[in-house]
């Protein structure tokens, strides 16, 4: 029963915060939950592969401007001539490294997920952020926890 209340609260917050992504995600999870035979099969698969599917969809969206010719090699070369371009490259590298550790942390330490979900909901709903942050947040958490020699137990 608690999970229904929690999911309902997330839906309400998403609705009040006008966050369609979180609203759709919550609704999908609830619809799957309504059918136990579905949830037994789908939840483990979505939990195990969902982040990778999401990254794939984001990657496809990022590559579309290249496919349509909106971004060409000259744009890449011009970007690399600027400090902002180099900062973008470094940030891309850092996010990839953080995300790697974030995925590992989410897999090995499920209890951190609750805190990350709360932080993500607050960031998305109240600060108009984007819910792509849990993996990166988990990566940052991994580094801070390691740096400060902390644990989750």
Swiss-Prot record:
Keyword Membrane included in the entry's annotation = yes
For this UniProt entry, what is the primary localization, expressed as one broad class? membrane
Q: What is the lineage of its organism?
A: Bacteria, Bacillati, Bacillota, Bacilli, Lactobacillales
Example GO CC term: the record gives: plasma membrane
Question: Where is the protein situated, by its record's location annotation?
Answer: Cell membrane
Q: Which topology term describes how it sits in the membrane?
A: Multi-pass membrane protein
Similarity section: Belongs to the UPF0756 family.
List residues traversing the bilayer.
4-24, 26-46, 51-71, 86-106, 116-136
Disulfide bridge positions per record: none
Indicate the segments annotated as coiled coil, or none if absent. Answer: none
InterPro entries in UniProt? UPF0756_TM (IPR007382)
Keywords attached to this entry: Cell membrane, Membrane, Transmembrane, Transmembrane helix
Write down what this protein is called: UPF0756 membrane protein LSL_0936
